[in-house]
Amino acid sequence: MTIIVILVIIPVLNAQKSEDKTIKLKIVPVRHYIFSKTDRDAHFWSAIYIASNNKVYVGTSTHASAASVYEFDIATSTMRHLANLTVLLDELGKGIWTNGKIHVKMQELDGYVYFSSFCEDNGPPAIDAGSYNGAYWFRINMETGKVEPLARVSSLWGTTGQAMDKNRRIIYGLDEIGHLRRYFIDENYTEDLGRVDDWDVCRTIFTDEAGNVYGSYPPGLIWKYDPEKERIFNLEFLRLPITIDSRSMANPMLDRRAQWRIIEWDPVDKVAYGIIGGSNLLFKFDVNKGPEGEIIPLAQMCAPAYRGGNPFDVPHATLAMTINQKDRKIYYIPVTRGDFDYDLVSTEIGITGKKAVPSQANRPSSYSFLVTYDLKTGVREDVGILVPTDGSYARGMEGAATDKDGKVWFVGSFEQSDEALKINGGFRSALGLGCYDPFSK
């Protein structure tokens, strides 16, 4: 693997706002794969899973119409479109709200990969909300690729977080309005366990080895569902190491900086590792230590120019974190500039009070930067800027997973290098699948 050292100018808005910080960053070659030359898959959050059959499963989203499911065969480098959810659910062309988003981490059980959906800004805006058929649980047959809808999550609210208790054969879903739902796989029905948060729910929940379910909510708080007691508890004495609390009085706040953004259970250490939404701080959550557990801060994983500076300048954490069991390192992909989700949010307010949202072609570029944390030594390493071998750039990632050989796969926004994609409404970026091999020489 060839590594090139370049100079990258990264604006850092700290006390000396007039100065730029020049940092030497390495360019790290990665592979870039296109999902489709015909579909317009626009967005992605969390939904990447590498199954035991050595295939990558990805759920994409839109803010207009349909969510899609793809399968990528690592052995043959073949991409296959498995399903359009609006076609699968017979929603397309009916003038109703549609299942246009997949926001959850997927799980595998008995030859199937499970996920769930929801609707946000999908379908005609001025319609009767009662026409919506609801959000669903789904499973993918790993042998055939068939995607099958199962029971409904609810008649209206879908999921933004998902975790599985394989022993009890239950899937947990955190819905848009903060209710925790559980799906009984064998019985094929859903149960509402009650509200754990408001609309500003965290994107990821996790289960520990005992089947307890955990989630976070602002400001730096944690809830726990105990399946033995069948109760939801707020952990009273445990706090996340947050540095920023929201000042917004909006409801919902749409902030999420004061909770974890991404978290993953590690079966080796029997702890969870997560990233704080605002500071990009990596932390360890030992659920078995003490009456409620213990939180240990480890390292700030944002791009190097922001470390130790103004905490309000740190770009929002991404969902692109994975634990690599081959080298026992955490791989995380923050962005070099911008804010929430692919640098598509503008925080500039004009004289009229309206948000100024420049065209994508005129925005300053953001880049994906790879950072690792060695769980054996506690050493953080700045690997470098991810640059696909096709000459494009990786702009912002929102999900990552590791295969059995230790290669790191990720999904997000890539600069469009394919001529067939450059007609995409003037947008310079599109969804893609990327791969980084840390063991390639």
Explain the meaning of each model-derived region.
Residues 33-67:
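Beta-strand-rich domains and repeat architectures in extracellular enzymes and scaffolds
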Residues 398-441:
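Blade-level signature of beta-propeller repeat domains, shared across WD40, Kelch, NHL, RCC1
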Residues 32-37, 83-98, 151-157, 197-198, ...:
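Surface-exposed loop and turn segments in beta-propeller and other repeat-based domains
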Residues 42-47, 90-105, 156-164, 199-209, ...:
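Repeated scaffold domains used in trafficking and secretory/extracellular systems
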Residues 115-132, 333-365, 413-430:
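Short, conserved, GDST-rich strand-edge loop motifs in beta-rich repeat architectures
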Residues 62-63, 119-121, 176-177, 218-219, ...:
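Residue-level signature of beta-propeller blades and closely related beta-rich strand-turn architectures
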Residues 50-53, 108-110, 165-168, 207-210, ...:
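Residue-level detector of Asp-centered blade-edge/turn motifs that repeat once per structural unit
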Residues 18-41:
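A short helix->beta-strand "capping" segment at the edge of beta-propeller domains
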